[in-house]
Protein backbone atom coordinates (compact mmCIF):
# COMPACT_ATOMS: atom_id res chain seq x y z
CA UNK A 1 0.00 0.00 0.00
CA UNK A 2 1.28 3.47 -0.93
CA UNK A 3 2.24 5.92 1.80
CA UNK A 4 -0.89 7.99 2.58
CA UNK A 5 -0.77 11.59 1.39
CA UNK A 6 -1.03 14.41 3.90
CA UNK A 7 -4.60 15.70 4.03
CA UNK A 8 -5.47 19.38 4.45
CA UNK A 9 -9.08 19.23 3.21
CA UNK A 10 -11.44 16.85 1.43
CA UNK A 11 -10.65 16.92 -2.28
CA UNK A 12 -11.28 14.67 -5.24
CA UNK A 13 -9.69 14.49 -8.70
CA UNK A 14 -11.74 16.53 -11.24
CA UNK A 15 -13.38 13.48 -12.83
CA UNK A 16 -14.39 11.95 -9.48
CA UNK A 17 -15.42 15.35 -8.13
CA UNK A 18 -17.87 15.70 -11.00
CA UNK A 19 -19.15 12.15 -10.47
CA UNK A 20 -19.61 12.74 -6.73
CA UNK A 21 -21.66 15.88 -7.29
CA UNK A 22 -23.77 14.20 -9.95
CA UNK A 23 -24.36 11.15 -7.74
CA UNK A 24 -25.37 13.41 -4.85
CA UNK A 25 -27.99 15.10 -7.03
CA UNK A 26 -29.29 11.72 -8.18
CA UNK A 27 -29.56 10.42 -4.60
CA UNK A 28 -31.35 13.62 -3.55
CA UNK A 29 -33.96 13.13 -6.26
CA UNK A 30 -34.19 9.38 -5.68
CA UNK A 31 -34.89 9.84 -1.98
CA UNK A 32 -37.86 12.08 -2.73
CA UNK A 33 -39.05 9.96 -5.65
CA UNK A 34 -38.60 6.75 -3.64
CA UNK A 35 -40.75 8.13 -0.82
CA UNK A 36 -43.49 9.26 -3.21
CA UNK A 37 -43.33 6.01 -5.16
CA UNK A 38 -43.66 4.02 -1.93
CA UNK A 39 -46.84 5.96 -1.14
CA UNK A 40 -48.04 5.35 -4.70
CA UNK A 41 -47.51 1.59 -4.28
CA UNK A 42 -49.60 1.54 -1.11
CA UNK A 43 -52.28 3.65 -2.81
CA UNK A 44 -52.35 1.21 -5.75
CA UNK A 45 -52.82 -1.71 -3.37
CA UNK A 46 -55.74 0.14 -1.78
CA UNK A 47 -57.15 1.25 -5.14
CA UNK A 48 -56.97 -2.26 -6.61
CA UNK A 49 -58.42 -3.73 -3.39
CA UNK A 50 -55.65 -6.31 -3.23
CA UNK A 51 -55.61 -6.44 0.57
CA UNK A 52 -59.32 -7.42 0.79
CA UNK A 53 -58.63 -10.20 -1.74
CA UNK A 54 -55.75 -11.50 0.39
CA UNK A 55 -57.90 -11.18 3.51
CA UNK A 56 -60.67 -13.24 1.92
CA UNK A 57 -58.18 -15.94 0.92
CA UNK A 58 -56.78 -15.95 4.45
CA UNK A 59 -60.22 -16.20 6.06
CA UNK A 60 -61.22 -19.04 3.73
CA UNK A 61 -58.04 -20.91 4.62
CA UNK A 62 -58.74 -20.98 8.37
CA UNK A 63 -60.90 -19.50 11.12
CA UNK A 64 -57.84 -19.13 13.34
CA UNK A 65 -56.37 -15.64 13.31
CA UNK A 66 -52.72 -16.68 13.53
CA UNK A 67 -53.12 -18.94 10.49
CA UNK A 68 -54.86 -16.13 8.64
CA UNK A 69 -51.87 -13.91 9.42
CA UNK A 70 -49.54 -16.51 7.93
CA UNK A 71 -51.46 -16.32 4.65
CA UNK A 72 -52.27 -12.61 4.48
CA UNK A 73 -48.98 -11.10 5.68
CA UNK A 74 -46.52 -12.80 3.29
CA UNK A 75 -48.82 -12.08 0.34
CA UNK A 76 -49.05 -8.37 1.16
CA UNK A 77 -45.33 -8.01 1.97
CA UNK A 78 -44.33 -9.75 -1.26
CA UNK A 79 -46.75 -7.60 -3.26
CA UNK A 80 -45.23 -4.43 -1.84
CA UNK A 81 -41.74 -5.77 -2.53
CA UNK A 82 -42.53 -6.63 -6.15
CA UNK A 83 -44.24 -3.30 -6.83
CA UNK A 84 -41.27 -1.43 -5.37
CA UNK A 85 -38.80 -3.40 -7.51
CA UNK A 86 -38.46 -0.68 -10.20
CA UNK A 87 -36.92 1.79 -7.76
CA UNK A 88 -34.68 -0.91 -6.26
CA UNK A 89 -33.48 -1.97 -9.71
CA UNK A 90 -32.83 1.62 -10.74
CA UNK A 91 -30.88 2.34 -7.56
CA UNK A 92 -28.69 -0.73 -8.12
CA UNK A 93 -28.08 0.24 -11.75
CA UNK A 94 -26.97 3.70 -10.57
CA UNK A 95 -24.59 2.13 -8.03
CA UNK A 96 -23.15 -0.12 -10.75
CA UNK A 97 -22.87 2.76 -13.20
CA UNK A 98 -20.86 4.84 -10.74
CA UNK A 99 -18.64 1.91 -9.77
CA UNK A 100 -19.80 1.68 -6.16
CA UNK A 101 -21.45 -1.69 -6.70
CA UNK A 102 -19.87 -4.53 -8.65
CA UNK A 103 -22.60 -7.03 -7.80
CA UNK A 104 -24.03 -8.90 -10.77
CA UNK A 105 -27.75 -9.01 -11.35
CA UNK A 106 -28.13 -12.69 -10.49
CA UNK A 107 -26.40 -12.20 -7.13
CA UNK A 108 -28.42 -9.04 -6.53
CA UNK A 109 -31.66 -10.87 -7.32
CA UNK A 110 -30.76 -13.63 -4.88
CA UNK A 111 -30.10 -11.05 -2.15
CA UNK A 112 -33.43 -9.38 -2.94
CA UNK A 113 -35.21 -12.72 -2.59
CA UNK A 114 -33.48 -13.40 0.73
CA UNK A 115 -34.41 -9.93 1.95
CA UNK A 116 -38.05 -10.50 1.02
CA UNK A 117 -38.03 -13.83 2.86
CA UNK A 118 -36.65 -12.21 6.01
CA UNK A 119 -39.18 -9.38 5.67
CA UNK A 120 -42.03 -11.87 5.33
CA UNK A 121 -40.98 -13.81 8.43
CA UNK A 122 -40.36 -10.78 10.64
CA UNK A 123 -43.29 -8.84 9.18
CA UNK A 124 -45.73 -11.69 9.76
CA UNK A 125 -44.80 -11.76 13.44
CA UNK A 126 -45.32 -8.01 13.84
CA UNK A 127 -48.58 -8.00 11.85
CA UNK A 128 -49.96 -10.93 13.84
CA UNK A 129 -49.22 -9.12 17.11
CA UNK A 130 -50.49 -5.76 15.82
CA UNK A 131 -53.94 -7.04 14.91
CA UNK A 132 -54.23 -9.14 18.06
CA UNK A 133 -53.61 -5.95 20.05
CA UNK A 134 -56.03 -3.91 17.90
CA UNK A 135 -58.82 -6.45 18.45
CA UNK A 136 -58.29 -6.43 22.21
CA UNK A 137 -57.86 -2.66 22.62
CA UNK A 138 -59.19 -0.61 19.69
CA UNK A 139 -58.51 2.68 21.51
CA UNK A 140 -55.10 1.93 23.05
CA UNK A 141 -53.56 -0.39 20.48
CA UNK A 142 -50.98 2.22 19.45
CA UNK A 143 -49.52 2.22 22.98
CA UNK A 144 -49.70 -1.51 23.71
CA UNK A 145 -48.27 -2.46 20.33
CA UNK A 146 -45.45 0.03 20.92
CA UNK A 147 -44.69 -1.67 24.25
CA UNK A 148 -44.64 -5.12 22.66
CA UNK A 149 -42.55 -4.04 19.67
CA UNK A 150 -39.66 -2.75 21.81
CA UNK A 151 -38.39 -6.11 23.18
CA UNK A 152 -38.93 -7.74 19.79
CA UNK A 153 -36.83 -5.00 18.18
CA UNK A 154 -34.08 -5.54 20.76
CA UNK A 155 -34.12 -9.28 20.07
CA UNK A 156 -33.77 -8.66 16.32
CA UNK A 157 -30.86 -6.29 17.02
CA UNK A 158 -29.21 -9.07 19.05
CA UNK A 159 -29.65 -11.85 16.48
CA UNK A 160 -28.99 -9.80 13.33
CA UNK A 161 -25.19 -10.32 13.30
CA UNK A 162 -25.65 -13.98 14.23
CA UNK A 163 -28.40 -15.03 11.81
CA UNK A 164 -29.41 -12.32 9.33
CA UNK A 165 -26.08 -10.79 8.23
CA UNK A 166 -24.51 -14.18 7.31
CA UNK A 167 -27.35 -14.71 4.84
CA UNK A 168 -25.94 -11.92 2.69
CA UNK A 169 -22.18 -11.90 3.30
CA UNK A 170 -19.29 -14.22 4.09
CA UNK A 171 -17.58 -13.81 7.46
CA UNK A 172 -14.33 -15.22 8.81
CA UNK A 173 -12.23 -14.67 11.96
CA UNK A 174 -10.25 -11.47 11.46
CA UNK A 175 -7.19 -12.96 13.12
CA UNK A 176 -6.96 -15.52 10.29
CA UNK A 177 -6.99 -12.75 7.66
CA UNK A 178 -4.97 -9.99 9.34
CA UNK A 179 -3.29 -10.80 12.69
CA UNK A 180 -1.58 -7.38 12.84
CA UNK A 181 -4.88 -5.52 12.50
CA UNK A 182 -6.50 -7.80 15.07
CA UNK A 183 -3.76 -7.01 17.60
CA UNK A 184 -4.10 -3.26 16.96
CA UNK A 185 -7.88 -3.42 17.37
CA UNK A 186 -7.49 -5.45 20.56
CA UNK A 187 -5.23 -2.73 21.97
CA UNK A 188 -7.74 -0.01 21.09
CA UNK A 189 -10.69 -1.96 22.52
CA UNK A 190 -8.77 -2.60 25.74
CA UNK A 191 -8.10 1.11 26.11
CA UNK A 192 -11.79 1.82 25.50
CA UNK A 193 -12.76 -0.64 28.22
CA UNK A 194 -15.02 -2.63 25.90
CA UNK A 195 -15.43 -6.40 26.04
CA UNK A 196 -14.81 -7.41 22.43
CA UNK A 197 -12.20 -10.20 22.40
CA UNK A 198 -10.37 -11.23 19.20
CA UNK A 199 -12.74 -14.15 18.66
CA UNK A 200 -15.51 -11.58 18.14
CA UNK A 201 -13.59 -9.62 15.50
CA UNK A 202 -14.56 -10.60 11.97
CA UNK A 203 -13.50 -10.12 8.36
CA UNK A 204 -16.38 -9.67 5.92
CA UNK A 205 -16.14 -10.41 2.21
CA UNK A 206 -17.62 -7.36 0.49
CA UNK A 207 -15.40 -7.08 -2.60
CA UNK A 208 -17.52 -9.43 -4.70
CA UNK A 209 -20.45 -7.04 -4.32
CA UNK A 210 -19.12 -3.56 -3.56
CA UNK A 211 -16.11 -1.27 -3.76
CA UNK A 212 -17.29 0.70 -0.71
CA UNK A 213 -15.29 0.77 2.53
CA UNK A 214 -16.65 0.04 5.98
CA UNK A 215 -15.80 -1.20 9.45
CA UNK A 216 -18.34 -1.28 12.24
CA UNK A 217 -19.33 -2.58 15.66
CA UNK A 218 -22.69 -4.34 15.83
CA UNK A 219 -24.82 -6.42 18.17
CA UNK A 220 -25.40 -6.24 21.91
CA UNK A 221 -24.22 -8.38 24.78
CA UNK A 222 -22.83 -11.68 23.60
CA UNK A 223 -23.46 -10.83 19.94
CA UNK A 224 -21.39 -7.61 20.01
CA UNK A 225 -18.55 -7.76 17.48
CA UNK A 226 -16.22 -5.73 15.27
CA UNK A 227 -16.58 -6.31 11.53
CA UNK A 228 -14.05 -5.08 8.95
CA UNK A 229 -14.77 -5.32 5.23
CA UNK A 230 -12.10 -6.82 3.00
CA UNK A 231 -12.26 -3.71 0.80
CA UNK A 232 -11.31 -1.62 3.83
CA UNK A 233 -8.31 -3.82 4.59
CA UNK A 234 -7.20 -3.52 0.96
CA UNK A 235 -7.45 0.28 0.76
CA UNK A 236 -6.80 1.57 4.28
CA UNK A 237 -3.80 1.35 6.57
CA UNK A 238 -4.04 -0.39 9.94
CA UNK A 239 -4.03 2.94 11.88
CA UNK A 240 -6.85 4.26 9.68
CA UNK A 241 -8.95 1.15 10.28
CA UNK A 242 -8.28 1.36 14.02
CA UNK A 243 -9.61 4.94 14.00
CA UNK A 244 -12.78 3.87 12.16
CA UNK A 245 -13.27 1.01 14.63
CA UNK A 246 -12.55 3.45 17.47
CA UNK A 247 -15.31 5.69 16.17
CA UNK A 248 -17.70 2.73 16.13
CA UNK A 249 -16.62 1.63 19.60
CA UNK A 250 -17.40 5.15 20.78
CA UNK A 251 -21.08 4.57 20.07
CA UNK A 252 -21.05 1.85 22.73
CA UNK A 253 -18.79 3.57 25.25
CA UNK A 254 -20.83 6.81 25.05
CA UNK A 255 -24.11 4.85 25.35
CA UNK A 256 -25.32 6.03 21.97
CA UNK A 257 -26.98 2.67 21.32
CA UNK A 258 -29.38 2.81 24.32
CA UNK A 259 -29.86 6.55 23.82
CA UNK A 260 -30.80 6.06 20.18
CA UNK A 261 -33.04 3.13 21.09
CA UNK A 262 -34.85 5.33 23.62
CA UNK A 263 -35.12 8.23 21.19
CA UNK A 264 -36.20 5.91 18.38
CA UNK A 265 -38.80 4.39 20.68
CA UNK A 266 -40.14 7.87 21.46
CA UNK A 267 -40.37 8.69 17.74
CA UNK A 268 -42.08 5.35 17.13
CA UNK A 269 -44.63 6.10 19.85
CA UNK A 270 -45.42 9.46 18.22
CA UNK A 271 -45.75 7.82 14.80
CA UNK A 272 -48.06 5.10 16.14
CA UNK A 273 -50.21 7.66 17.96
CA UNK A 274 -50.53 9.84 14.86
CA UNK A 275 -51.43 6.73 12.87
CA UNK A 276 -54.13 5.89 15.42
CA UNK A 277 -55.53 9.42 15.28
CA UNK A 278 -55.75 9.43 11.47
CA UNK A 279 -56.66 5.86 10.51
CA UNK A 280 -60.24 6.15 11.78
CA UNK A 281 -60.87 9.27 9.70
CA UNK A 282 -59.28 7.66 6.65
CA UNK A 283 -61.41 4.52 6.90
CA UNK A 284 -64.62 6.51 7.44
CA UNK A 285 -63.85 8.47 4.28
CA UNK A 286 -62.52 5.72 1.98
CA UNK A 287 -62.87 2.40 3.82
CA UNK A 288 -65.92 1.16 1.88
CA UNK A 289 -64.33 2.16 -1.41
CA UNK A 290 -61.22 0.15 -0.53
CA UNK A 291 -63.18 -2.84 0.82
CA UNK A 292 -61.98 -2.38 4.41
CA UNK A 293 -64.40 -3.36 7.19
CA UNK A 294 -62.64 -1.53 10.01
CA UNK A 295 -59.34 -0.97 11.78
CA UNK A 296 -59.26 -4.58 13.02
CA UNK A 297 -59.58 -5.88 9.44
CA UNK A 298 -56.39 -7.34 7.97
CA UNK A 299 -57.12 -5.27 4.85
CA UNK A 300 -56.60 -2.01 6.78
CA UNK A 301 -52.84 -2.61 6.90
CA UNK A 302 -51.90 -0.79 3.64
CA UNK A 303 -53.82 2.29 4.81
CA UNK A 304 -52.05 2.20 8.17
CA UNK A 305 -48.66 1.69 6.49
CA UNK A 306 -49.32 4.67 4.23
CA UNK A 307 -49.92 6.91 7.25
CA UNK A 308 -46.93 5.56 9.19
CA UNK A 309 -44.69 6.07 6.14
CA UNK A 310 -45.73 9.72 5.86
CA UNK A 311 -45.24 10.48 9.55
CA UNK A 312 -41.88 8.70 9.67
CA UNK A 313 -40.63 10.65 6.65
CA UNK A 314 -41.76 13.96 8.16
CA UNK A 315 -39.91 13.18 11.40
CA UNK A 316 -36.75 11.94 9.66
CA UNK A 317 -34.95 15.33 9.86
CA UNK A 318 -35.31 15.24 13.66
CA UNK A 319 -33.98 11.69 13.81
CA UNK A 320 -31.12 12.58 11.45
CA UNK A 321 -30.13 15.62 13.53
CA UNK A 322 -29.78 13.46 16.65
CA UNK A 323 -27.83 10.87 14.65
CA UNK A 324 -25.42 13.51 13.28
CA UNK A 325 -24.77 14.72 16.84
CA UNK A 326 -23.92 11.21 18.01
CA UNK A 327 -21.75 10.57 14.95
CA UNK A 328 -19.80 13.76 15.67
CA UNK A 329 -19.26 12.64 19.27
CA UNK A 330 -18.09 9.25 17.99
CA UNK A 331 -15.60 10.99 15.67
CA UNK A 332 -14.24 12.86 18.68
CA UNK A 333 -14.07 9.64 20.68
CA UNK A 334 -12.21 7.90 17.85
CA UNK A 335 -9.61 10.68 17.86
CA UNK A 336 -9.21 10.48 21.63
CA UNK A 337 -9.03 6.70 21.96
CA UNK A 338 -6.37 6.47 19.23
CA UNK A 339 -4.34 9.42 20.55
CA UNK A 340 -1.08 7.97 21.85
CA UNK A 341 -1.70 4.66 20.08
CA UNK A 342 -1.38 6.22 16.62
CA UNK A 343 1.12 8.97 15.74
CA UNK A 344 -0.67 12.11 14.50
CA UNK A 345 -4.11 10.57 15.07
CA UNK A 346 -5.90 13.61 13.61
CA UNK A 347 -4.12 13.27 10.28
CA UNK A 348 -4.73 9.51 10.26
CA UNK A 349 -8.45 10.10 10.87
CA UNK A 350 -8.57 12.68 8.06
CA UNK A 351 -6.87 10.18 5.74
CA UNK A 352 -9.47 7.56 6.69
CA UNK A 353 -12.34 9.90 5.85
CA UNK A 354 -10.62 10.95 2.61
CA UNK A 355 -10.41 7.29 1.60
CA UNK A 356 -14.06 6.70 2.53
CA UNK A 357 -15.20 9.77 0.62
CA UNK A 358 -13.10 8.99 -2.44
CA UNK A 359 -14.33 5.42 -2.82
CA UNK A 360 -17.94 6.16 -1.83
CA UNK A 361 -18.05 9.34 -3.97
CA UNK A 362 -19.10 11.60 -1.09
CA UNK A 363 -20.32 15.03 -2.17
CA UNK A 364 -17.57 17.67 -1.64
CA UNK A 365 -20.15 20.42 -1.06
CA UNK A 366 -23.56 19.09 -0.01
CA UNK A 367 -26.19 21.78 0.44
CA UNK A 368 -27.43 22.62 3.92
CA UNK A 369 -30.88 21.42 2.86
CA UNK A 370 -29.52 18.02 1.83
CA UNK A 371 -27.66 17.64 5.11
CA UNK A 372 -30.69 18.74 7.15
CA UNK A 373 -33.15 16.48 5.37
CA UNK A 374 -31.20 13.34 4.57
CA UNK A 375 -27.76 13.12 6.23
CA UNK A 376 -27.61 10.92 9.32
CA UNK A 377 -23.81 11.51 9.47
CA UNK A 378 -21.91 14.80 9.22
CA UNK A 379 -20.62 15.44 5.70
CA UNK A 380 -17.15 14.13 4.85
CA UNK A 381 -15.72 17.67 4.39
CA UNK A 382 -16.98 18.65 7.87
CA UNK A 383 -15.59 15.49 9.45
CA UNK A 384 -12.15 16.05 7.93
CA UNK A 385 -12.11 19.68 9.06
CA UNK A 386 -12.92 18.58 12.60
CA UNK A 387 -10.26 15.85 12.64
CA UNK A 388 -7.59 18.32 11.52
CA UNK A 389 -8.60 20.97 14.06
CA UNK A 390 -9.31 18.89 17.19
CA UNK A 391 -6.15 18.81 19.29
CA UNK A 392 -6.67 19.62 23.00
CA UNK A 393 -3.38 17.91 23.88
CA UNK A 394 -1.21 20.52 22.13
CA UNK A 395 -2.59 23.11 24.56
CA UNK A 396 -1.88 21.00 27.62
CA UNK A 397 -5.44 19.72 27.86
CA UNK A 398 -6.93 16.27 27.59
CA UNK A 399 -9.75 14.55 25.78
CA UNK A 400 -13.34 14.95 26.90
CA UNK A 401 -14.14 11.23 26.77
CA UNK A 402 -10.76 9.46 27.07
CA UNK A 403 -8.36 10.76 29.71
PLM features: residue spans?
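N-terminal signal-anchor/signal peptide hydrophobic helix marking the start
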Residues: 295-304
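Polar-ligand-bearing catalytic/cofactor-coordination segments
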Residues: 1-295, 309-313, 317-403
Amino acid sequence: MDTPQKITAYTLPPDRDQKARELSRIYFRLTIIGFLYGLFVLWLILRWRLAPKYRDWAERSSAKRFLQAMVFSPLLILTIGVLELPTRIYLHSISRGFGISVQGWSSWSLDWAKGELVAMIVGTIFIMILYAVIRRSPRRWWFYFWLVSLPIGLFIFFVQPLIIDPLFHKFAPLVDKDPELTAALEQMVHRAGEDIPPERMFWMGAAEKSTALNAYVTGIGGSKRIVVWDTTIAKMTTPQIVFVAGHETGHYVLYHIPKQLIFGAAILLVVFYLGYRCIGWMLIRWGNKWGIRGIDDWASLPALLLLLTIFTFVLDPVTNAISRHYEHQADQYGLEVTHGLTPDSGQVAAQAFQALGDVNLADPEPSRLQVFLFYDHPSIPDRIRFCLSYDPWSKGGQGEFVH
